[in-house]
Every structure is written in structure tokens, then in C-alpha cells.
Amino acid sequence: MPSKKPIYKKPYEPVNNVDESVWFSNDQPIMETDFTFVFNDRYPCVQGHKLFIPKENNSHFVGRSYGMAYDYGNQKIKAGEIDGFNVGMNMGECAGQTILWPHIHFIPRHRNDSKEPGGIRLAHPSGDHKQHY
């Protein structure tokens, strides 16, 4: 009996479990834990852009995935491979989410990699972009 081919969801289609996510139709994870899959981003904004994808859609798995991205970034800093990193998540179409399964973006940063490195304040057009702490 032939095995049933998984149905992968397209951008903006509801995803019921991580196995339906488009990431598995394109690639295999580069790392995996009990809670998280890690993929290279297919459309990276910089070299080293990774996606930390929780295996379940709940706060415990999402939190563990965030923690893994944070630890990964700190290891890269300690190794001298990067100077800093951004870790973030777009939740909901209005926030820029296209794959409707939670996933955390890890973006490595280097000194002077951007004229204006910005931060979260630059994400919203009506924000006060002059305020720095």
C-alpha cells in the first residue's frame, strides 16, 4: 500500500500541525530537539537567518523554541561568529505572518552591518523613531 503523501499548506492557509507546514515540503531541519525544529530560512534577510519552529502550537513549546534561539545566539557570540542577534516572531497576518504556524526568526547581526540598525520601534510606521533609551 503506498504511503499517503502529506498535504503541505500554502502561505496564509491555516496550519493544524507542524507536519503540514511548508518548511517540510522544501527542506529538512538542520537541528531538532524534543520541542523544536530548526531550519535555514528559505528567504533569508541575512546569511545565517534561521527559523526555530515549535513542534506544538502552545506557549510551552513556543517558549522553549525562543529559549533555544536565545541560547544559539549567545553561543555564536561567545564563539566570535556574530556580534549580536535579533530574535522575533510575527503573529497574525496584520503582523506580517505568512506561514500560519508559530515560528521564531533568528537573525545574526554584525557591527556596522546596517547604517541604522533600528530595532522594534522601526517596525511600525507611526512609531516614535527618534526615541532611544
What do the predicted segments below correspond to?
Residues 1-133:
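HIT superfamily nucleotide-processing domains
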